[in-house]
Amino acid sequence: EVEIKTVADPFMNEETEKFLRKCGVQNVTKDAEDILQDEEIDAVLICSSTDTHSKYIIEAARAGKHIFCEKPIDYDLGKVREAIQTAEDAGVKLQIGFCRRFDHNHRGVYDMVQSGRIGKVQMIKISSRDPEPPAIEYVKVSGGIFYDMMIHDFDMARFLAGGAEVTEVVAAGSVLIDPAIGEAGDV
């Protein structure tokens, strides 16, 4: 059983606050520090932009909070390693939001692979498309489509391979809808 006690959002507005209170959230704040200092809170869900993930993971781990964080942890491998190490050193659980592993359709494919029903995996080919382009403001802080969304495909490839290490990755992409995405340096 989970109780959401506090939601922190630096962009909190009256409408969002009203909605959260209607959902039973006791506290709303613009400052994440309020959550980290609350000893009654055991775990945090970090669903901010990618450029803040490692910072919040480190702060939450140091505050003794278990962590579920949206992917990816960071675009900088050094910061990723620091965040993971900080969580390990603090003895808190850290889970990254690779939600496709828990989707029943993807899980069905995994189960068929593991049972041998569809044979031995030799190659995995994944095609992905988002239903709509992200807002350009998000593209600028998310790391772009490869960091933000294609990471799911890489995770699924490793998951479906059942422990076998990936030996080669080929990726291609292009901007077909909103030229501003390409101008922001994505794809």
What role is predicted for each listed range?
Residues 3-4, 40-43, 66, 92-93, ...:
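Structural signature of beta-strand start/N-cap positions in the alpha/beta core
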Residues 29, 68, 93-95, 125, ...:
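Structural detector of well-ordered beta-strand residues that form the stable sheet scaffold
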Residues 23-86:
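Beta-loop-alpha module in the N-terminal Rossmann-like domain of NAD(P)-dependent dehydrogenases
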Residues 5, 134-187:
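Rossmann-like dinucleotide-binding domain that binds NAD(P)(H)
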Residues 1-23:
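N-terminal Rossmann-like dinucleotide-binding module
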Residues 9, 123-126, 168-171:
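Hydrophobic/anchoring residues in structured secondary elements
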Residues 51, 74-135:
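A contiguous active-site-proximal alpha/beta segment in oxidoreductase catalytic domains
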